[in-house]
UniProtKB/Swiss-Prot annotation:
Coiled coil: none annotated. Pfam families: Hormone_2. The modification Arginine amide is found at R127. GO terms for cellular component: endoplasmic reticulum lumen; extracellular region; extracellular space; plasma membrane; secretory granule lumen. GO terms for molecular function: glucagon receptor binding; hormone activity; identical protein binding; receptor ligand activity; signaling receptor binding. This is Pro-glucagon. The gene is GCG.
Length: 180
């Protein structure tokens, strides 16, 4: 959306510049016509008009310079914000944390991945029924609370793990014909 405004601003500046130039050309033609009819040294109005014209030309040139300078500054600002926005986003992502009271650890993620790999390997090998000794630790985790006294989302994770283990035990213990 900003680029549309930028392009529209440039277009307005170009139209304004061409409009001013056509007015200056018209003024010069009318001035040359009146100058040919009267002597410039004897006419004080002509001298004032020349002075006013030179001041107007300077003002016009200066305003064109300021407009182009503003356009350059705006483009530079856009480029800097784009560069800074990317750096800010990267820095923000690096320091972004989870909700208050929870903490993620690379070690725990690694251990969970290893446990999943071991379980899949155990299923593929087709070993017999296995009891899960971690159930004792899970029961202890159920009673754990955060410092503020609220249950965490770990409760849902633990319950999901228990349900998955019960389902896998049921799959292992029942025969294929009993499942239908």
């Amino acid at each position: 959306m900003k680029s549309i405004y930028f392009v529209a601003g440039l277009f307005v500046m170009l139209v304004q510049g061409s409009w001013q130039r056509s007015l200056q050309d018209t003024e010069e033609k009318s001035r040359s016509f009146s100058a040919s009819q009267a002597d410039p040294l004897s006419d004080p109005d002509q001298m004032n008009e020349d002075k006013r014209h030179s001041q107007g030309t300077f003002t016009s040139d200066y305003s064109k310079y300021l407009d182009s300078r503003r356009a350059q500054d705006f483009v530079q600002w856009l480029m800097n914000t784009k560069r800074n926005r990317n750096n800010i986003a990267k820095r923000h992502d690096e320091f972004e944390r989870h909700a208050e009271g929870t903490f993620t650890s690379d070690v725990s993620s690694y251990l969970e991945g290893q446990a999943a790999k071991e379980f899949i390997a155990w299923l593929v090998k087709g070993r017999g029924r296995r009891d899960f000794p971690e159930e004792v630790a899970i029961v202890e985790e159920l009673g754990r609370r955060h410092a503020d006294g609220s249950f965490s989302d770990e409760m849902n994770t633990i319950l999901d793990n228990l349900a998955a283990r019960d389902f896998i035990n049921w799959l292992i213990q029942t025969k294929i014909t009993d499942r239908k």
